[in-house]
């Protein structure tokens, strides 16, 4: 599962987190480590659609459309991980993102008794890294509250969707 992020930064420049995740997913696919890529992200607005953008870039990298499955309700990491299990039937999963994000995703997966491993995309350095560290600190606190205090699940579940051949 490839976790979503914006294709561009607020200043309009390409987001290195996004493109490094695409490269990581493509590397896993072309090395034969994964056969399908579940792209999970936010698409609350027509003009902002993380799964569509990830699919487009993965196809540009040479990955066939038939090997890309889109999850349009991955509004946050909790949604993406739980939907991977409950909607897409994945109990064993490789999660692709940067290390800081993967640590949170793996925590959620283990909370839901999933067999999950992480593949870490390259982390950009500099000011972006510092901003992300602050955001991640807050996201982890929210995750703990969501899981252990509020016991929140995903915003949407839905009809089960099978990945791969039937």
Model-identified regions with their sequence ranges:
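Short linear elements at protein peripheries
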Residues: 154-166
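A transmembrane-helix-recognition feature enriched in membrane-embedded lipid enzymes
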Residues: 133-156
């Amino acid at each position: 599962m490839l976790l979503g992020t914006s294709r561009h930064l607020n200043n309009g420049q390409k987001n290195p987190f996004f493109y490094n995740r695409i490269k990581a997913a493509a590397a896993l696919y072309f090395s034969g480590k994964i056969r399908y890529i579940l792209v999970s992200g936010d698409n609350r607005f027509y003009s902002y659609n993380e799964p569509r953008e990830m699919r487009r870039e993965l196809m540009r990298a040479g990955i066939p459309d038939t090997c890309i499955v889109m999850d349009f309700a991955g509004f946050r990491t909790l949604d993406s991980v739980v939907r991977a299990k409950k909607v897409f039937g994945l109990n064993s999963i490789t999660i692709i993102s940067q290390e800081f994000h993967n640590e949170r995703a793996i925590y959620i997966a283990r909370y839901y008794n999933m067999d999950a491993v992480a593949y870490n995309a390259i982390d950009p350095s500099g000011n972006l890294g510092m901003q992300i560290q602050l955001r991640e600190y807050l996201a982890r606190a929210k995750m703990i509250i969501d899981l252990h205090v509020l016991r929140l699940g995903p915003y949407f579940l839905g009809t089960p969707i099978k990945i791969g051949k039937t």
